[in-house]
């Protein structure tokens, strides 16, 4: 008899789902994205993360990964860095379509619009793989119903590391579900820090000097009108949080919505 369970796209293992990998794309030596089948019962809010991983010798090796796909997608997408000696990514980097990845059952996180007060403009500030939750959010029709404008910034060391977000934003233009809503309302700004280019500099510096706002032709951050989501390195999170609080922004949470939110539990360096 055929083992239909092993042939299934998703196997329910109790604490986790074993989901079949459907697609893998490598952008640089350090960055890649992959898609898996999605469990029919798995629901999440755009911007949340899940524990994902691989089977280990004694127990699964798991890390928190933001879901990069929108909530309406019938697959799950994740965006990952490759760390040579990372407990998970040193193996995850070699996955191929047909392999299985463990996916947790309980999405959570603070990078959700529920944790923000109503506002006019939503800023999504990211570095590196911190772009992942925003990849989900900018593909959600509801985000464009909540905010007049969405500003998505992505800062990396070099231009090739921006390929994921650039391709994503370009594909949105012809997306049948959100393309029309995003047109003229989604503002994408990228910058690099370790090479010359048309836009260079850390996002914290670009905000502090006002160059970001000059480039996108928008006023400086204002807690009366703007809401901010932040995902990236710990140093970037801490610096931006300090900058925002100095400007009168209050940090929000699922329990008490505010003017800005940060996410610290994402798949970053050393995983």
Stretches found by the model and what they are:
Residues 2-99:
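Ferredoxin-reductase
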Residues 133-145:
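Histidine-anchored nucleotide/phosphate-binding helix
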Residues 47, 130, 233:
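Short, conserved phosphate/pyrophosphate- and ester-handling motifs at nucleotide-, phospho-/glycolipid
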Residues 127-133:
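Ser/Thr-glycine-rich phosphate-binding loops at phosphate-binding pockets of nucleotides
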Residues 116-121, 223-224:
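Short helix-loop-beta connector
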Residues 122-125, 229:
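Conserved beta-strand elements of the Class I
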Residues 2-6, 11-17, 153-154, 158-271:
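Reductase modules of NAD(P)H-dependent flavoproteins
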């Amino acid at each position: 008899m055929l083992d239909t369970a092993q042939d299934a796209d998703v196997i329910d293992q109790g604490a986790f789902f074993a989901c079949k990998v459907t697609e893998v794309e490598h952008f640089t030596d350090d960055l890649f994205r992959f898609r898996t089948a999605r469990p029919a019962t798995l629901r999440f809010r755009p911007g949340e993360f899940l524990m994902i991983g691989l089977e280990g010798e004694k127990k699964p090796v798991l890390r928190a990964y933001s879901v990069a796909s929108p909530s309406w997608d019938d697959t799950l997408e994740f965006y990952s860095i490759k760390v040579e000696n990372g407990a998970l990514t040193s193996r995850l980097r070699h996955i191929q379509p047909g392999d299985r990845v463990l996916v947790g059952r309980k999405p959570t996180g603070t990078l959700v619009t529920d944790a923000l007060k109503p506002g006019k403009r939503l800023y999504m500030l990211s570095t590196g793989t911190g772009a992942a939750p925003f990849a989900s959010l900018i593909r959600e029709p509801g985000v464009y119903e909540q905010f007049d404008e969405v500003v998505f910034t992505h800062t990396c060391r070099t231009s090739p590391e921006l390929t994921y977000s650039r391709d994503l934003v370009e594909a949105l233009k012809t997306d049948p579900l959100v393309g029309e809503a995003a047109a003229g309302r989604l503002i994408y700004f990228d910058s690099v820090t370790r090479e010359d280019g048309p836009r260079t500099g850390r996002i914290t510096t670009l905000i502090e000097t006002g160059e970001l706002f000059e480039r996108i032709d928008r006023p400086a951050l204002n807690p009366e009108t703007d809401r901010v989501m932040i995902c990236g390195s710990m140093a970037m999170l801490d610096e931006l949080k300090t900058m925002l609080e100095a400007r009168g922004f209050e940090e929000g949470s699922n329990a008490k919505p505010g003017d800005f939110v940060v996410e610290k539990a994402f798949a970053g360096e050393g995983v």
